[in-house]
Amino acid sequence: MQDKYTPAAVEATAQQHWESTQAFKVAEDAGKPKYYCLSMFPYPSGKLHMGHVRNYTIGDVLARYHRMRGFNVLQPMGWDAFGMPAENAAIQNNVPPAKWTYANIDYMKTQLKRLGFALDWSRELATCKPDYYRWEQWLFTRLYQKGLIYKKLGTVNWDPVDETVLANEQVIDGRGWRSGALIEKREIPMYYMKITAYADELLEALDTLTGWPEQVKLMQKNWIGRSEGVEVHFPYEVSTIGASGVLKVFTTRADTLMGATYVAVAAEHPLALQAAVNDPELAAFIEECRHGGVAEADLATMEKKGMPTGLRVVHPLTGEHLPVWIANYVLMGYGEGAVMAVPAHDERDFAFATKYRLPIRMVVRSTRDAYTDTVAPWQDAYAEQGRLVNSGKYDGLHFHDAIEAIAAELTAKGLGAKRTQYRLRDWGISRQRYWGCPIPMIHCADCGDVPVPDEQLPVVLPEDVAVTGRGSPLAKMPRFYECDCPKCGKPAKRETDTMDTFVESSWYFLRYASADNGQAMVDERVNYWAPVDQYIGGIEHAILHLLYSRFFTRAMRDEGLVNVSEPFTNLLTQGMVVAETYYRDADGGKKQWINPADVEVERDEKGRIVAAKLTADGAPVVIGGIEKMAKSKNNGVDPQALVDQYGADTARLFIIFAAPPDQQLEWSDSGVEGAYRFLRRVWSFGHAFVSEFRPQLPADRQLDAVQLPEALAAVRREIHVCLRQANYDFGKHQFNTVVSAAMKILNALEKAPRDVAAAHAQVAEEGLDILLRLLAPITPHVAHALWQDCGFTGDVLHASWPEPSEDALRQDEIDLVLQVNGKLRGSLRVAAGASNSAIEALALGSETAQKFMEGKPPRKVVVVPGRLVNIVV
């Protein structure tokens, strides 16, 4: 055995052993409970970052721990490989996205292996490979035939220079992020997944997800946004609109209907377009709205603007004729693209009405009695529920009664009805991009839209493509889009849009169960492994990815592909990795961010940074505070450099010890060095055991607790107390305190008296056995090497999780904290099973208590069994 800890050699040996024995390849086993542990798969961006390392370390600790607990553990890995970054890299580096992506996968796979993760690589998948997306296309055709996928016009952000559609986050101040061109809103044909068909089930099933954080469930609940309300029909004023019809609006506040003073429609609404035909000013305003954002977040912050159309509709209850305005805060994609405006009781309508001097009519007296006849500055109380005023026959009715009465009258008149509406919208999956899964549809002039037949799947994405950033490469590639119609055989055109990359990540966890099956999307093995028992990933995926995965699992269930409804039983959202930032002011008001590795810092007595300078020139830099590790702030730590210097086990140990998994992890170089020192101490103790203690073991290796000297019995007890606490903490995912327990065990072993050599060797052997098994999920390489070197049976990978010994925990005597009037005054040694009355007598008779009681009689004595005794005088 080497006397010094050399991480590179230790880790290479362990990893070679695991690979040669296929240690983590797993199959279904009906005789064992299964544990499917999965961390969200990475986008192959080029290199792992610390967020990746933390995510996968947490998952690996859980997977290895459950393996030691006797579970049949699956922990697979794959690559979320489609997406815009590959296209951007292709433009910058003049390399096809496929080549860039596969090179990144190779490099990152090597990194993951060097970190020692217990991954079943036989199930590896990459979403950009035809053997994966073939089945996505196959399911698309099934859902299309069922009506769960359909086609309609959708509003998008169009960059006229790059000739492409941009995501909302790519539009900056109304301009394309790359071209700088003014963005237009365009309506183009798109495919949608009918997630709204599952809205009720997705909402109601949230209550069954007891293993999910409440915050995530609340975010999904709000996103689905079920609301009970009333659909109100405002008949057209024929004299201004020129035809009969109704304008439909949905409201959750039908009680305020009598306060409606105008209606507002989206710029794309048919009434708006009709009004603009002969009105250039209105047409120009609609064009301006087309350049605005299409996200709700944009509407909340942008200036509210509008124009009157000259059209009018009729109030369904009062007969009053209300003006129709075009407003930039109304979206065509939400509800009917129209709202009834009640300025007195809606803050957004209030701001709009105040700006354009529209009538404001109070019709609700709030419970806080904020009612006045004239509306001054907006008060939150105006939006509250209350009793109706200025509402004719409905005056005096409270909120619920008013809604019921008004809904009943609207229904009777045929001008409305009660309705349930959802904030959730169907999922538009068409993307006018190259690097994605081709949509398996063919457009025929005679037959319309025709799904690609099964025998023609997959529709393979050409990989030898030059991406310029202008237009869709597929739309410029006749060899891709020219085809024959599967129905009539005439020349037709293949769909050139690709799918949203969230589609790939919505079912990959089910594909892992049978990733080797080339004949089916999934097979019966999926019903052994699904659902995922523990899913790990960032809370930024709380809504889209996790909601889409829940939807996909149900869609696949209803196709008879899986037997489960929920994809993930337990969800752990790990905290961010953060680090200090430093910068210098540069030209143009910009900041030049400096990596912490290039900075020398000065700290105060509490360890806080008070000054910093650049190592290269010794001149000061500005301390920017703690931020999430990011390229933009240049405060990242390269995991590869960390592993090269300290080893994977040190990186894993620091990540687990620095913070509980769901909390923010603050990077600390000194913390990394501390983790490395601890592992060197573990190694040194293992070496001492092999060279000094093991030869002193008696022939009969059975540890006799009765014969142990008291001091060694105390050491053994401390070890098992730590183990008991570690077992509890592991169950609570408090891995940092598991490491604390391991450190206490090592401290106890190092300080154990050695005067009775054989007994000491026995305690050392048992303690080291426990320590290595405790560390095996966290620092598996060190545990693997020392387990073998120290002569323990078999492979630590196959060892069971240690359990505390009641024999070791048993105490003849225990020490209690002794207090007088609640203040610590000493300790009191009592028999382990002493009664409360016996403890009281011992406490009152002790010299320490007598001294601090100062001759005063005790009022009462409080005994907390096993912990303390408090004398109150």
UniProtKB/Swiss-Prot annotation:
Assigned GO CC terms: cytosol
EC number annotated for this UniProt entry: 6.1.1.4
Motif ('HIGH' region): 42-52
Keywords, alphabetical: Aminoacyl-tRNA synthetase, ATP-binding, Cytoplasm, Ligase, Nucleotide-binding, Protein biosynthesis
Binding site for ATP: K631
Annotated SUPFAM superfamilies: Anticodon-binding domain of a subclass of class I aminoacyl-tRNA synthetases, Nucleotidylyl transferase, ValRS/IleRS/LeuRS editing domain
PROSITE patterns referenced in this protein's UniProt entry, alphabetically: AA_TRNA_LIGASE_I (PS00178)
First-listed, main subcellular location of the protein, grouped into a coarse class: cytoplasm
Molecular function in Gene Ontology: aminoacyl-tRNA deacylase activity; ATP binding; leucine-tRNA ligase activity
UniProt keyword ATP-binding, yes or no: yes
Reactions the enzyme catalyzes: tRNA(Leu) + L-leucine + ATP = L-leucyl-tRNA(Leu) + AMP + diphosphate
Family matches, as InterPro entries: aa-tRNA-synth_I_CS (IPR001412), aa-tRNA-synth_Ia (IPR002300), Leu-tRNA-ligase (IPR002302), Leu_tRNA-synth_edit (IPR025709), M/V/L/I-tRNA-synth_anticd-bd (IPR013155), Methionyl/Leucyl_tRNA_Synth (IPR015413), Rossmann-like_a/b/a_fold (IPR014729), tRNAsynth_Ia_anticodon-bd (IPR009080)
Compartments, record wording: Cytoplasm
Gene Ontology terms describing biological process: leucyl-tRNA aminoacylation
The UniProt record lists the keyword Ribonucleoprotein: no
Location of the motif 'KMSKS' region: 628-632
PANTHER family: LEUCINE--TRNA LIGASE, MITOCHONDRIAL (PTHR43740:SF2), LEUCYL-TRNA SYNTHETASE (PTHR43740)
Protein family (similarity comment): Belongs to the class-I aminoacyl-tRNA synthetase family.
Database matches in NCBIfam families: leuS_bact
Protein name: Leucine--tRNA ligase
Gene it is expressed from: leuS
